[in-house]
């Protein structure tokens, strides 16, 4: 039952990790608000602090633990939720006695009551981890109904309207949860579960709500967006959904993220590359370029396949944005494999390259593989690839000088300069475009036409111009 205003409890919500976690946090904030709670990001005057953790790789786990310990310094009870909490549960609770409770995804529907128990000093059982892939049928088409029956995270439980936690013109919109791929290095499916799509009508309804709150760009997120619809009986559901999202009143741009190269079919490439209102932007999870390394990773493709894919994309959309992440130092990787990765990156002309050093993840196949590379060698290879990537990304930005861009404004300086993102730049994770000579009266969330006149590392500088000159 919702609390009265006088008795309204309060919670600070701290979010770490990826955009999917940001959506989870906003759903939890909306749920708590519907129960009469006040939710804020300021932990200075609240009853409890909730930290939505990330458990993806070693560095993310460390950041989450640091955030949990830091939150305890304000003298309020601290509760861990999110991926790290779901993945490690009681083990995490035992190692961090400073934290009042560790709750898994299955506690989300009853979160308000769990937090009330913590505030009141009542004992709250720590989460017991379970491999969430085992909770759903193997056949994807049977999953949505079963997910609803068992209250699987994000399915069957319809959250209250999200509470947006900032006024950004960009909003993240979740397409699905879970993943069916079995990459040797990745533990995500074990705690996020098997892949389950959200019904298109639900995605559209949330997109309209986000537009009504001031969102101008919708960024679609999931663990694997190319799989969207395979469990709904329509493996091309994303091709049908994108134009409908782009047609929502108030939405200037729709962007798809988390694309698997091996599943990127020609019809989806064409839809992303040519649909009005959809950013010609390809967030491609290559991970490496050596065929041998990729096979050990339990992934498909190789450098030649990836270059062919990029070539096809650029035939349809010559100015398309393309980004990827790569893992360096995977077990068995040789100097020749690293050289092949270097050749691929040089030929790929990517706008953004994320470089990660391999680290063992509990419960993964790769953690048990022979051929481990020592940390010092991995660090040297990471630095080598990162230096090359920085050089290549800077050159790619220089190559865009002279291009016409439409910039979604995120900030307006007192000088009148604007900062935002063009279609080839994803908010928060990619570079930005600074617009000079902008007309007066431009506000955050507006779109400005401009032409690129310079680059600053990966970032661009553009001069505002009339639409017919862009």
Task: Locate each region found by the language model.
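Proteins enriched for Cys/Gly/acidic motifs involved in redox and nucleic-acid/cofactor modification
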Residues: 1-228, 267, 276-278, 282, ...
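Terminal RNA-binding accessory module
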Residues: 2-3, 368-470
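Conserved glycine-rich "GG(E/T)P / GGGxP" loop and the immediately following alpha-helix
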Residues: 55-60, 215-240, 244, 248, ...
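Flexible glycine/acidic-rich beta-alpha junction loops that bind and position SAM and/or redox cofactors
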Residues: 89, 222-232, 263-267, 286-298, ...
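Short, electropositive alpha-helical surface patch
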Residues: 233-246, 266-280, 333-350, 375-380, ...
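Radical SAM/AdoMet-radical enzyme domain recognition
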Residues: 239-240, 247-253, 264-324
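Intrinsically disordered, low-complexity polar regions and short flexible loop motifs
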Residues: 256
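Hydrophobic, well-ordered secondary-structure elements that form the walls
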Residues: 284, 325, 345, 353, ...
């Amino acid at each position: 039952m919702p609390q009265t205003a006088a008795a309204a409890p309060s919670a600070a919500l701290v979010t770490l990790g990826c955009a999917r976690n940001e959506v989870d946090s906003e759903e939890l904030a909306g749920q708590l608000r519907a129960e009469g709670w006040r939710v804020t990001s300021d932990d200075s005057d609240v009853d409890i602090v909730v930290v939505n953790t990330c458990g993806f790789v070693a560095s993310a786990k460390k950041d989450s633990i640091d955030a949990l310990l830091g939150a305890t310094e304000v003298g309020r009870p601290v509760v861990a939720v999110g991926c790290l909490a779901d993945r490690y549960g009681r083990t995490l609770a035992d190692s961090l006695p400073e934290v009042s409770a560790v709750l898994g995804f299955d506690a989300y529907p009853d979160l308000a009551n769990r937090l009330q128990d913590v505030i009141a000093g009542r004992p709250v059982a720590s989460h017991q981890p379970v491999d969430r892939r085992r909770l759903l049928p193997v056949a994807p088409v049977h999953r949505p109904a079963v997910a609803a029956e068992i209250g699987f995270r994000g399915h069957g439980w319809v959250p209250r309207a999200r509470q947006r936690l900032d006024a950004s013109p960009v909003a993240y919109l979740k397409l699905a949860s879970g993943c069916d791929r079995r990459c040797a290095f990745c533990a995500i499916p074990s705690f996020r579960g098997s892949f389950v799509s959200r019904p298109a009508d639900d995605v559209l309804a949330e997109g309209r709500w986000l537009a009504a709150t001031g969102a101008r760009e919708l960024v679609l997120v999931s663990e694997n967006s190319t799989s969207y619809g395979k469990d709904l009986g329509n493996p091309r559901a994303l091709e049908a959904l994108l134009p409908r999202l782009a047609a929502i009143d108030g939405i200037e741009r729709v962007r798809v993220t988390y694309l698997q190269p091996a599943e990127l079919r020609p019809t989806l490439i064409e839809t992303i590359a040519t649909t009005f209102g959809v950013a010609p932007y390809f967030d491609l999870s290559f991970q490496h370029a050596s065929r041998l390394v990729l096979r050990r990773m339990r992934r498909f493709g190789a450098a030649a396949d990836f270059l062919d894919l990029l070539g096809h994309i650029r035939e349809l959309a010559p100015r398309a944005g393309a980004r990827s992440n790569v893992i360096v130092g995977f077990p068995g990787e040789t100097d020749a494999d690293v050289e092949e990765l270097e050749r691929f990156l040089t030929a790929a002309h990517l706008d953004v390259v994320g470089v990660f050093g391999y680290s063992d993840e509990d419960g993964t196949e790769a953690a048990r593989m022979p051929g481990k590379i020592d940390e010092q060698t991995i660090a040297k290879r990471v630095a080598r690839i990162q230096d090359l990537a920085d050089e290549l990304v800077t050159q790619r930005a220089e190559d865009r000088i002279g291009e016409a861009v439409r910039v979604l404004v995120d900030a307006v300086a007192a000088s009148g300069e604007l900062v935002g993102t063009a279609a080839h730049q994803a908010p928060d994770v990619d570079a930005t475009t600074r617009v000079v000579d902008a007309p007066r009266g431009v506000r955050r969330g507006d779109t400005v036409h401009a032409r690129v006149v310079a680059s600053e590392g990966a970032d661009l500088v553009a001069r505002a111009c009339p639409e017919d000159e862009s």
